[in-house]
Amino acid sequence: MSKSSSGDSKNTLYCSFCGKSQHEVRKLIAGPTVFICDECVELCMDIIREENKTTLVKSRDGVPTPRDIHAVLDDYVIGQHHAKRVLSVAVHNHYKRLAHGTKHNDVELAKSNILLVGPTGCGKTLLAQTLARIIDVPFTMADATTLTEAGYVREDVENIILKLLQAARLQRRAAQRGIVYIDEVDKISRKSDNPSITRDVSGEGVQQALLKIMEGTVASVPPQGGRKHPQQEFLQVDTSNILFICGGAFAGLDKIIAQRGKGTSIGFGADVRGPDERSTGDILREVEPEDLLKFGLIPEFIGRLPVVATLSDLDETALVEILTKPKNALVKQYQRLFEMEDVRLEFSDDALRTISHKAIQRKTGARGLRSIMESILLDPMFDLPGLSGVESILVNKEVVEGRAKPLYVHAERRGEQQAPGA
């Protein structure tokens, strides 16, 4: 049994694994002959989670089932069940195709790239990142607004493949099975329904440049990037088995879809329905290729993205869940940060709802939650390293609204008091 037997601390108990005393940890669990602290229990749980994740990835010839993929996505992404279902099936089929070969009895299995349509901050990027972790393949992101056709100033589309190769630590075979997420593809729509007379190198031109690498080609990739080193040896990367996921907010697409669904007749046969009361997410779910064409994507580009998953706006309830429920939830991250100072960070329910309401007002979705949290916790994070005796900090609705300072609870008095300088 881990006990000290000298001086005043003869009755002090210690963790049998890390050696910390009962005063240095929050909980110390006693067994028949040993003790284990809460920190070691958490470490054990992390190890078990990693083992479970490895087991998932190795199931069924290395291809997890759609249900398994969906379950892991649920751990990290709140809501968006329809999108997660579509993605789970698409990713499962893609890597099953690679595991069993693309050709069998003269039947060639074509690649199905994915288009994610949804407002800013609804989880598009997080979904793509989590999928790459589940399958355990290299992953890279690119911003479509920074791309241009080869030969023009800005970034060549081939640099996307270079980034993927770097993510794979220059292992070409691994890179050729990776996932590429291209964000803001709605920003490279052409400026009108008719083909432009002048060269559109950052809109339609980028769509044209992306076509070949998305469908499958052998790309010549400069290891040092760009074309400034003409003597360098180019790497040949086959993009046929790289899964491309494109995402964008597509602001205004819902209006195009709704307009298509409206009747144009007059008289007795007229469509007399009132304004569409459905949510934006429900309308987007009815998207058709013709709607994307009207929005400004070229037919060939639409054809390279046969799987379309639509995401909905996040409401206040969903944002509160995003703050608290996922394994890497923001509240958990900041609580861990404060634990490093031996301080417990607590949020009231109305504080969480107010934070979520602020994010909705800013129209930033889940992406805006971190900046709000940083603003709220700036003073405590500044003061805490120089203070002693603080046991916990409470954030309530008034703190989020800027009408009060966070409440500090001191260990010796166990009474609430405002932050220093309040």
Swiss-Prot record:
Coiled coil: none annotated. Residues 3-56 form the ClpX-type ZB domain. Zn(2+) binds at C15, C18, C37, C40. It holds the Pfam family ClpB_D2-small. GO terms for molecular function: ATP binding; ATP hydrolysis activity; ATP-dependent protein folding chaperone; protein dimerization activity; unfolded protein binding; zinc ion binding. ATP binds at P119, T120, G121, C122, G123, K124, T125, L126. SUPFAM superfamilies: Glucocorticoid receptor-like (DNA-binding domain), P-loop containing nucleoside triphosphate hydrolases. This is ATP-dependent Clp protease ATP-binding subunit ClpX.
